[in-house]
Amino acid sequence: MNEILKKPYVELKDSLNSGKISSTELVSACINRIREVDGAVKAFLYLDEKKVLNSAEESDKRRKEGKPLSEFDGMPVAIKDNICIRDTITSCSSKILENYKSPFHATVVEKLLEKGFILFPRTNMDEFAMGSSTENSAFQTTRNPFDLERIPGGSSGGSAAAVAASMVPLALGSDTGGSVRQPASLCGLYGLKPTYGTVSRYGLVAYASSLDQIGPFSRELQGCIDLYSVISGKDVRDSTSIHRPKFSASDVQPQDFKGLKVGVIKMTPEIQSEVVKSYDKVLNQLKEKGATLVDIDFSKFGFAIPIYYIIATAECSSNLSRFDGIRFGSRKDKTGKLEDLFVDSRTEGFGPEVKRRILLGTFSLSAGYYDAYYGTAQKARALIRKEYESFFSKVDCILQPTSPTTAFKIGEKTKDPIQMYKADIWTTSVNLAGLPAMSVPMGADQKGLPIGLQITTPHFQEGKLFGIALALSTLEGMNIQFPESIK
């Protein structure tokens, strides 16, 4: 691996700004690393090498002229395949969109380009972001760089694997029920799910509109802080976007543990023992440093997964109705009959998991079952929000493992969707409540597989969230050794 890619993100940024390395050198190192390891990892669906090199050369030219667009000018960032980039295929890892080229940029893409970031599209994902393992892609299964026989998490597994394998220093994913945090946990990364509405969803292909959020990945915390500072902010093109004071990365300071009230949860027998051990180790260190640990009752949140899957699949059923072979999506016209065109296009275009969720959502929205399922789920969602409000009247943050286990083997849970859904047991409630949360590395198990810790804070407290994450990174046993050789 090129020595450049061994540098921490902050050192890479400083080296670009000081002229120690050029963007062309950095981008070339990324391309060579992708050529070297992505045949095994399969993080990228496609990369236009010529285009990214041209962008890097333009960045270097700006710096030579003393006109860099920002301190990030020339920094590579990978983009998940459901975030639109003009004149670039945005397939959502689905056959139905395999030839769709977006005619516009997503807002987050515009913001990245304005700052001079070099875009590396497109990273693999679960089809239409529906999955927890990236096994549901219509094109390939992404593998975990720590163990190629295991999953990287999902649905943003391609973005997470690309960063963990040192192909790129930064990446964007999307999080509907844990799709940034869970892959971050399983790949040893920092991964942020922002407060709902603080990052524009314009140009993000919708799965569940009331739950989706775009979020960053990085091997170091500062990468997530910097990306969030760039992509956050009000956007008039997104009706759910919220106006807030501009977040500044320079305002983030390490949180003093003394007097910090930390909500903690009780571990249950089905949680992997090494996850419990790592969690307990963190809590013991916090107690020693003066934090107050407050037990919170998470028993009601056992309903979060069924609530989430009723609401998410209902919104999925509505959002994906546009992919019919006429408005959007590949057209399969075998008989010349309009109804057959719809059926054939969707039958051949969607994969099994997407079809399953469309059916679930259509059922819960049907006239005879709407109140019993969707209506009840929305009432329960409001109760989850109130429960979090109650928690945060007593604590400053909640700490819990991001995932109940480390990365499982490819194919281990594909035949049992319920077991797959349970991987999101601690992440879905955060999306239902619209809260900010972040997965941070919490060491590794005996096999060297990463374990993640989830930090949750009240709405709009990303600054505090980052401060807590920064302080946690100094604790014993939190660091991850990333693999250099991947075979």
UniProtKB/Swiss-Prot annotation:
GO terms for molecular function: ATP binding; glutaminyl-tRNA synthase (glutamine-hydrolyzing) activity. One of its GO terms (cellular component) is glutamyl-tRNA(Gln) amidotransferase complex. It comes from the Bacteria. Keywords: ATP-binding, Ligase, Nucleotide-binding, Protein biosynthesis. Its EC number is 6.3.5.7. The keyword Nucleotide-binding applies. Heterotrimer of A, B and C subunits. This is Glutamyl-tRNA(Gln) amidotransferase subunit A. It comes from Leptospira interrogans serogroup Icterohaemorrhagiae serovar copenhageni (strain Fiocruz L1-130).
